[in-house]
């Protein structure tokens, strides 16, 4: 009996059910925390990658945008633009620059349709036969393509690629990681790190953050005439009869609340982590999903 007692006391006590459940619960909590940390780390990396992509694209966009402006300022406006400007040569030159920008950077397939008489190109360039060769290429590339929510992204990709003039690294090689055909329509789009198409706004104006980004000093002449293309305020003249037509076709000119011109620059946007853009056609906020959007004008160029 003494021997049996010694043998019994030497046996290792097993875990109780409660102890096993506690261990399992601890492991589950640690696994959940680890998974959360990994997901959070991936989210931060996706954010950084998207910001890097947008900065790269914006740098390329700004270079091509500036080139189109410089060339347009050397040209004489078309008769149709001069008529819209009410015969004012300075105002006509400002409008002509915006016309050329609309030609170089379309945001919708219909803007390239030769059969739609009300497009900017068909109204103000085509009658004088001065359509740029790259626009003819645009028309061929989008022929038969249907409109949709991704077309501004496809249009920007098409423009940046077609307008490349230097002999360096090809545009596609620079951003091939950010190109995909997300909807299978045969037109590639520029995408963010979450795989969603970026959006491109050519002449946005209705966004408080964008207007606050005006780099000119408050109270200065440049702040009042904050349209970078119309630094003289030619479009703000109240006696200009063609202004309603211009605003309907391009963008509103004057902020009625402040009396200043709108700060109008091209903008590239990602829907961000929640993958909801929630923006109107004028860059206005249309829902809570816009809160985490990533805007090009908020990122400093390297």
Predicted segments, located by residue:
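N-terminal compositionally biased, intrinsically disordered segments and leader/signal-like regions
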Residues: 8-9, 17, 51-54
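N-terminal single-pass transmembrane signal-anchor helix
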Residues: 12-41
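N-terminal leader/signal peptides at the extreme start of proteins
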Residues: 1-15
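Sequence-pattern detector for short linear motifs
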Residues: 9, 47, 101-103
């Amino acid at each position: 009996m003494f021997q049996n007692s010694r043998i019994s006391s030497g046996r290792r006590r097993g875990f109780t059910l409660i102890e096993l459940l506690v261990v399992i619960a601890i492991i589950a909590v640690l696994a959940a925390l680890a998974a959360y940390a990994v997901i959070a780390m991936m989210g931060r990396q996706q954010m950084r990658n998207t910001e890097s992509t947008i900065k790269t694209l914006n740098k390329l966009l700004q270079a091509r945008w500036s080139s189109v402006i410089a060339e347009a300022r050397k040209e004489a406006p078309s008769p149709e633009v001069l008529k819209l400007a009410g015969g004012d040569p300075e105002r006509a030159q400002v409008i002509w620059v915006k016309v050329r920008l609309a030609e170089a950077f379309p945001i919708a397939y219909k803007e390239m349709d030769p059969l739609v008489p009300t497009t900017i190109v068909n109204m103000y360039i085509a009658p004088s036969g001065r359509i740029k060769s790259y626009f003819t290429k645009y028309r061929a590339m989008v022929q038969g393509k249907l409109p949709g929510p991704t077309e501004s992204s496809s249009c920007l990709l098409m423009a940046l690629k077609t307008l490349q003039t230097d002999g360096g690294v090809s545009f596609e090689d620079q951003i091939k990681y950010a190109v995909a055909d997300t909807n299978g329509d045969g037109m590639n789009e520029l995408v963010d790190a979450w795989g969603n198409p970026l959006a491109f706004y050519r002449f946005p104006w209705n966004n408080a953050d964008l207007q606050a980004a005006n780099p000119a000093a408050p109270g200065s002449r440049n702040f009042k005439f904050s349209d970078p293309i119309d630094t003289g305020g030619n479009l703000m003249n109240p006696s200009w009869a063609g202004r309603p037509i211009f605003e309907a076709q391009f963008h509103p000119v004057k902020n009625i609340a402040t009396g200043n011109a709108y700060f109008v620059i091209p903008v590239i946007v990602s829907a961000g982590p929640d993958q909801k853009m929630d923006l109107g056609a004028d860059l206005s906020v249309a829902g809570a999903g816009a809160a985490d959007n990533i805007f090009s004008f908020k990122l400093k160029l390297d």
